[in-house]
Amino acid sequence: MSNTAYIGSGTTLSSKYYLRSFYRSDREAGTSSKRREFSGNQLALADGRALRKAVRRLTSSDFSDDQGTNTRNSVLAYIQTYNNMLSSAGSSSDRTLERSAKQLKNITSEYSSELDKIGITVNDDGTLTSRTTLFESADLSKFKELFSADAAYMQRTSTYAKRFASRGEALVTSDNNLLMQKKMPLPQVLPQQTAPPHPVPQRVRMTALPPLRHRSYPRVWIWIPS
């Protein structure tokens, strides 16, 4: 399958083009060599968003013969996105993500026979692999049965992809809030001011005064002539 995009009449777009468009909000998360730079929760959010975009792209396809190459290339990008989502869920300890991924694997397993008819194998670990010869030669009507807007497989996948993305967003928001709290300076604690110690009252020694003694003085008479 060609990975070259030809712009013009009857434009053919590569699977890499579709993969980049699915990861447009988190472009580097769609690149294998860059995924290690993301946290598990960031990957879960990116993969959930990308899978929802992949579903929207596939369900908007007309599955006509002149768009056969684009349809197949978009399905190849869907397979990569789906596998990325299972990978990020597998490395997460969050039970909600694990449950959503498990449900998606169960749904895909239910359609393993239909997928096999267009050259897509559901592996034991739940991931998907395309078998080139059958994938490129299978009738587009069989692709439509699985990936059109009316297909139950896409409708059910869309539901759990949305849950996966919503949970990833909540986890990333929580991580960012914790990071902000760690970066905030701690409030300065002023030393507690204590009142000066009260002076210890000094004991006053009381000394008894001697009793007053009354002294008698001789009377003096003054004569004043009239």
PLM features per residue range, with description:
Residues 1-226:
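Polar, low-complexity export/assembly segments characteristic of proteins
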